[in-house]
């Protein structure tokens, strides 16, 4: 007898229902895309915004100024050694790299071959604290100064005489007037007489403020001279500073290798009253370094102690 109940089998999967899951996902995805397309863009939160750095401003690289370099040991340079052997001051200074390099090396103690006490060289410094060595020093050779003279002390070193001739010629050519000289080289013995005369007239303190004692005078080196204005006839040294020649010399002397050794601003260092007539020869290179460096005394130029008084 057959049972009225038939065995129950799982109903076959509907093809529509079997594809329902993928279709649902598709519908969902389409909905999302449509909502994104139709809805306004969401504003990102402040924390989500990445702040970009400001662009770097490109600046021009400054030009590198390359100047002359000083040798680590200038005194070992072949050119310096050769110049020292023949006592050529200009070549020695050139071997150091020029006037300013020479000065810098001396001040730094990097020039053991250079003595500021040697009166045979243009860089010698003689003052109230630095007597000449030897004290009765005399230059090896002298030449007549090619300018009008008011005394018989009309000589100087040959390089000084030549430079003075060029200076006087250019001053006249430029309309400044004629320049002569009162004194050039004075020997130790003549300086004894000169200083004694000042002592008689002004007393010891007055003499020491206006005249060097023997052995302490730049005139004894042959590197110094006192100049005067000669318009028709030559005047005295005291009037020189107020003349057209005095103004021209103050402005231009350095171009010929000279400096005005005793200025008003340097009295506390040198111990001498201003002497606009007293020219000291350093040579063109050192005089240019002195001028461009704004110096007013040789003591400052070579970083030496002030010397306003004698030791005794």
Q: What is each model feature region?
A:
Residues 2-183, 188-312:
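Extracytoplasmic cell-surface/polysaccharide-interacting catalytic and binding patches
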């Amino acid at each position: 007898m057959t049972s009225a109940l038939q065995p129950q089998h799982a109903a076959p999967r509907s093809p529509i229902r079997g594809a329902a899951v993928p279709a649902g996902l598709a519908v969902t995805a389409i909905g999302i895309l449509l909502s994104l397309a139709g809805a306004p863009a969401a504003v990102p939160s402040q924390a989500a915004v990445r702040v970009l750095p400001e662009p770097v401003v490109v600046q021009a690289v400054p030009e590198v100024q390359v100047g002359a370099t000083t040798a680590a040991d200038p005194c070992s340079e072949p050119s310096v050694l050769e110049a020292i052997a023949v006592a050529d001051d200009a070549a020695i200074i050139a071997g150091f790299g020029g006037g300013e390099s020479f000065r810098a090396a001396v001040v730094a103690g990097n020039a053991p071959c250079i003595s500021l006490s040697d009166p045979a060289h243009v860089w010698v410094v003689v003052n109230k604290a630095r007597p000449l060595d030897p004290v009765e020093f005399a230059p090896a050779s002298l030449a007549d100064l090619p300018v009008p003279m008011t005394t018989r002390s009309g000589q100087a070193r040959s390089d000084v005489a030549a430079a003075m001739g060029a200076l006087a010629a250019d001053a006249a050519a430029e309309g400044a007037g004629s320049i002569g000289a009162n004194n050039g080289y004075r020997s130790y013995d003549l300086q004894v007489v000169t200083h004694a005369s000042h002592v008689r007239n002004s007393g010891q303190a007055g003499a020491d403020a206006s005249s060097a004692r023997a052995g302490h005078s730049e005139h004894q080196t042959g590197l110094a001279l006192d100049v005067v204005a000669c318009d028709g006839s030559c005047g005295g040294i005291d009037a020189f500073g107020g003349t057209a020649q005095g103004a021209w010399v103050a402005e231009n002397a350095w171009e010929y290798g000279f400096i005005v050794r005793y200025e008003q601003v340097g009295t506390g260092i040198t111990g001498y009253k201003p002497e606009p007539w007293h020219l000291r020869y350093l040579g063109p290179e050192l005089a240019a370094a002195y001028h461009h460096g704004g110096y007013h005394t040789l003591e400052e130029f070579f970083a030496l102690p002030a010397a306003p008084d004698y030791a005794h």
